[in-house]
Amino acid sequence: MTYLEIEGTNHLSGNVTISGAKNAALPLIVSSILAKNEVKINNVPNVADIKTLISLLENLGAKVNFQNNSALLNTNTLNQTIAKYDIVRKMRASILTLGPLLARFGHCEVSLPGGCAIGQRPIDLHLLALEKMGANIQIKQGYVVASGNLKGNEILFDKITVTGSENIIMAAALAKGKTKLLNVAKEPEVVQLCEVLKDAGLEIKGIGTDELEIYGSDGELLEFKEFSVIPDRIEAGTYLCAGAITNSKITLDKVNATHLSAVLAKLHQMGFETLITEDSITLLPAKEIKPVEIMTSEYPGFPTDMQAQFMALALKANGTSIIDERLFENRFMHVSELLRMGADIKLNGHIATIVGGKELNAADVMATDLRASSALILAALAAKGTSKVHRIYHLDRGYENLEEKFKDLGAKITRLEE
């Protein structure tokens, strides 16, 4: 097993280039199932989740060429509609194949998903929506077995769901007639999926709002244009927190600051200043790091995927910070590891109270999920001594060239084999 060795209390400086968004690339790659032509996608991050999804598509018969952050996808050769457990178990996003496979072929079987062990993350909302569109759905031996010709309908999501919105948008693209979706997720990743489908000829209204109207093509495949994946706002936020926790000046390149409004607002409240251009953000050191109150919510609110990183940053603040996690249960699994480094954090249900300003000391810590592992790296950057972060396969699922990027900023970080 590999681990990261990190020497703390070093200043960072320089530039880091932000990769394409993993959470945008996943549904965009899946959307190639709706294409009549070969689809070229640029700025695709070379991370484990992307490779897992490509394996899944190849398993279904697609031809995929992925190199130099560009993916060339041909789904005309699809000859299989069963997404098998041994691939799906590695990653939740595999459930995204359900809507497009069903819409294109009229039947499919998709194993119930795996991925990070964060809360329940139920897929009932996906299934209820597909049933409303005329699908017959059964759960058999750990598989979602779906069949039927999809027809447009009005669908209200009881809760905002990002993957649910994406799945049903793709299903509605090939369905017969108009689908009206209410309480749709407004995340930039969902917006890009809609824009790409619109460019491919789909009639879709309300992009960027919580209400979409999609006029399905009744089974006719779409003609995709070449496009690039949007920058990863969570990766960007993580590097901003790395600059902040070491109180350093760093610049992020190839980033979209408008997608980071909530994160930047909290950094400003904590005493940091930023210089923003069309595609860069420079973080300036704070005179004093102030405590902060954060409540996670759906976009454009504060992202749950940045909660762990800000908890690490709050350990350096001069005072007591509060983090209220509203979206997922079990999303404080990093707390026990931060305590090993000398953190003062108290949990009460979904609320964490962080007393900052105490010295952090290096320790051996273990990552439990993708974003928790990045919080441990941030804490290690600020801790006195050399820390080891274990189970970093979680990091490899979502961060491209992580240690190289940190090294470019001057961090002392090494990947080693146990």
Swiss-Prot record:
**Highest taxon, organism lineage:** Bacteria
Q: Does the keyword Cell cycle apply?
A: yes
Q: Which CDD domains match?
A: UdpNAET
A Gene Ontology biological process noted in the UniProt record is: UDP-N-acetylgalactosamine biosynthetic process
Give one GO molecular function term: UDP-N-acetylglucosamine 1-carboxyvinyltransferase activity
Gene Ontology cellular-component terms for this entry are: cytoplasm
Q: Which UniProt keywords apply?
A: Cell cycle, Cell division, Cell shape, Cell wall biogenesis/degradation, Cytoplasm, Peptidoglycan synthesis, Pyruvate, Transferase
List 2-(S-cysteinyl)pyruvic acid O-phosphothioketal occurrences by residue. Answer: C116
The EC number on file is 2.5.1.7
Q: What is its main location?
A: cytoplasm
Q: In which pathway does it act?
A: Cell wall biogenesis; peptidoglycan biosynthesis
Catalytic residues (UniProt): C116 (proton donor)
Positions that bind UDP-N-acetyl-alpha-D-glucosamine: R92, R121, P122, I123, D124, L125, D305, L327
Q: Which reaction does it catalyse?
A: phosphoenolpyruvate + UDP-N-acetyl-alpha-D-glucosamine = UDP-N-acetyl-3-O-(1-carboxyvinyl)-alpha-D-glucosamine + phosphate
> Where is phosphoenolpyruvate annotated to bind?
K22, N23
Q: Where in the cell is it found?
A: Cytoplasm
* NCBIfam families documented for this protein: murA, PRK09369.1
Entries under HAMAP family matching the protein? MurA
* PANTHER family reported in the protein's UniProt record: UDP-N-ACETYLGLUCOSAMINE 1-CARBOXYVINYLTRANSFERASE (PTHR43783:SF1)
Q: What does this protein do?
A: Cell wall formation. Adds enolpyruvyl to UDP-N-acetylglucosamine.
Q: Which family does it belong to?
A: Belongs to the EPSP synthase family. MurA subfamily.
Its recorded name reads UDP-N-acetylglucosamine 1-carboxyvinyltransferase
Organism, by scientific name, is: Campylobacter jejuni subsp. jejuni serotype O:2 (strain ATCC 700819 / NCTC 11168)
Q: What is the lineage of its organism?
A: Bacteria, Pseudomonadati, Campylobacterota, Epsilonproteobacteria, Campylobacterales
